[in-house]
């Protein structure tokens, strides 16, 4: 199957998923890509793995005949941090110096400047860690499919699929956003519900049930 797990270059039919973004944005991109390509690749790293699975399931329920291949692997991630421990030690040593050593300081200024320059160049520390990664390949082309491959999943039943166009997905996204905000009259309903539970009538009913 295409889609190497070792390459870091993004392919034209690949969608890299972040756990912070809205899943419907990626679903929209996937449906648009299926108009040009027979298969797409959904990829994610670390916390985004659960988002990759979620997006793949949403796409499979909006497009018919999608065969799925799941790839799990690890890759090295380099973290760069600044090490200021050397500068802190120099600051402590300067505080401990007495007034009798002022004459010696003039002679040591050049040496200290050279040492500080060396420390400034060596302040960056690199850490190499391994992070889990996932790639899910969704394919419409049945001729190039090896159904015995590890990680293969057959298409969903047509009864479970509701085919949608990119325009319909955008409408679904706007509807969900409106529904989350409460829509028309949503704020009034929430305020009514809050006031109802804060009234004495509700408290009296709770007292009667206890007795």
From Swiss-Prot:
**Keyword Mitochondrion among UniProt keywords:** no
> Which ranges are annotated Acidic residues under compositional bias?
100-113
Q: Which gene name belongs to this protein?
A: ALBA2
- State the name under which the record lists this protein: DNA/RNA-binding protein ALBA2
Name its cellular compartments: Nucleus; Chromosome, Telomere; Cytoplasm
**What keywords would UniProt list here?**
Chromosome, Cytoplasm, DNA-binding, Nucleus, RNA-binding, Telomere
A Pfam family of this chain: Alba
List cellular component terms (GO). Answer: chromosome, telomeric region; cytoplasm; nucleus
- Chain spans, region Disordered: 84-121
* Quaternary assembly: Identified in a TARE6-associated complex consisting of over 30 proteins and including ALBA1, ALBA2 and ALBA4; the complex binds to the non-coding subtelomeric repeat region TARE6.
Function, in words: Possesses DNA- and RNA-binding activities. Binds to DNA with relaxed sequence specificity. Associates with the subtelomeric TARE6 repeats.
Q: Which SUPFAM superfamilies match?
A: AlbA-like
Give GO terms: molecular function aspect only.
DNA binding; RNA binding
Annotated Basic and acidic residues bias: 84-99
As for family, the record states: Belongs to the histone-like Alba family.
């Amino acid at each position: 199957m295409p889609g190497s797990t070792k390459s870091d270059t993004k392919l034209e039919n690949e969608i890299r998923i972040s756990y912070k973004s809205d899943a419907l944005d990626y679903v929209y991109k996937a449906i648009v890509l299926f108009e040009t390509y027979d298969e797409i690749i959904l990829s994610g790293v670390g916390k985004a793995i659960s988002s990759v699975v979620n997006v793949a399931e949403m796409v499979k329920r909006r497009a018919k005949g999608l065969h799925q291949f799941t790839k799990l692997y690890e890759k090295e991630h380099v973290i760069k941090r600044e090490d200021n421990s050397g500068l802190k030690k120099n600051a402590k040593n300067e505080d401990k110096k007495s007034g009798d050593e002022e004459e010696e300081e003039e002679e040591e200024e050049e040496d200290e400047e050279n040492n500080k320059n060396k420390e400034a160049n060596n302040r960056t520390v690199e850490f190499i860690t391994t992070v889990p990664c996932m790639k899910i390949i969704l394919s419409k082309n049945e001729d190039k499919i090896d159904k015995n491959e590890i990680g293969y999943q057959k298409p969903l039943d047509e009864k479970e699929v509701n085919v949608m166009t990119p325009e319909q997905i955008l409408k679904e996204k706007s509807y969900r956003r409106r529904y989350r905000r409460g829509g028309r009259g949503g704020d009034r309903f929430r305020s009514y519900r809050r006031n109802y539970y804060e009234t004495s009538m509700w408290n009296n009913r709770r007292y009667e049930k206890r007795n």
